[in-house]
Amino acid sequence: MSATAVPKAKRIPQWKIEEVEYLTTLFKSYPVFAIADLTGFPTNQLQKLRKKLSKKVLFRVSKNKLILRALRNAGIDTSKFEELLTGQNLLLFTHMNAFELSLLLDKYKAKTYYKPGEIAQQEIVIPEGNTGLSPGPILSTFSKLKIPTRIQGNSIVITRDTVVAKPGDTISEELASLLQRLDIALKEVKINIKAAYDHGIIILRDQLVLDLEEYKNMVMNAHLDALKIGSEIAWPVPEILELSLNKAFRQALALAAEAGYVTPDTAEYVFRAAIMKALALAAEVSKYAPDLGLEVPTIQPTTPPEKKEEEEKKEEEEEEAETVSEEELAEGLGALFG
């Protein structure tokens, strides 16, 4: 009677076990992490970026299955991450909030070569000058792309700047090869975050994109609205009281001028108001009694000096509101998830 064969359990490589343990520790240690797409990002540029941001962000490239296992081990729901973990990914661990991290990465872009079939992001110009390339089969590529050349010594010289592609054009094999031979790297790439995890909340890429101008305008308008309301109710804080007192002073002057209440401070405005009323009356009388020959001069009304001061104050407040930095906006939005 033969014994039933028992299949041997597949042995998991030690490096995978250690990697999962390390990632699990990172997921538990950092309140914020992001999963980013590494597709097309040059390795040498990634190393430079890793070094530049080493004090703020920890970079880690790992296998997608190992990332998922580590997430589960750390007690994090993987349902939304499973569909995102395709292709080559980069893990970013930080103590900044997710919005700060996104803004930080947006500042760093790298240049790489275009590949055949890709779409030109900008106008591509082959510059005039010595290419350093020896004459040979490549001359047919220059000819096909309508780039004027001449031979000087043992080098190909481009005789004038030539536009070989415009934004939206598809890059041909010949052009991609020539750009690489000429060391013209024009394609702009950056690390794109797929999703971020901030203190238990998953934030997808679209939600991390900030319209900074819109937020600045919102902050500025909210600040100005607060000043208006505060000055209306005379909220007892130094910044508001100054506006409220200016407003009350102007209203008091207007009331005194209307009531004819004369003091050293109001005399000018009382008399001016009286003169304006008299002139208005004279103008009206002259319509019905032109024989009187009344000549009514035009006098420009005087604005109390306090109004100018208030306008200057408002301009200062607007300038202060406009100085809100990207980091402050990111911190404020990040606080919603803290």
From Swiss-Prot:
What are the annotated GO cellular component locations?
Answer: cytosolic large ribosomal subunit
Q: Where is this region: Disordered?
A: 295-338
Q: Determine if DNA-binding is one of this entry's keywords.
A: no
Task: Return the Pfam families for the record.
Answer: Ribosomal_L10, RL10P_insert
Say yes or no: keyword RNA-binding present.
yes
Assembly and partners are described as: Part of the 50S ribosomal subunit. Forms part of the ribosomal stalk which helps the ribosome interact with GTP-bound translation factors. Forms a heptameric L10(L12)2(L12)2(L12)2 complex, where L10 forms an elongated spine to which the L12 dimers bind in a sequential fashion.
Q: What does this protein do?
A: Forms part of the ribosomal stalk, playing a central role in the interaction of the ribosome with GTP-bound translation factors.
Please state what the protein is called.
Answer: Large ribosomal subunit protein uL10
Query: From which source organism is this entry?
Result: Staphylothermus marinus (strain ATCC 43588 / DSM 3639 / JCM 9404 / F1)
What high-level taxonomic lineage is stated for the organism? Answer: Archaea, Thermoproteota, Thermoprotei, Desulfurococcales, Desulfurococcaceae
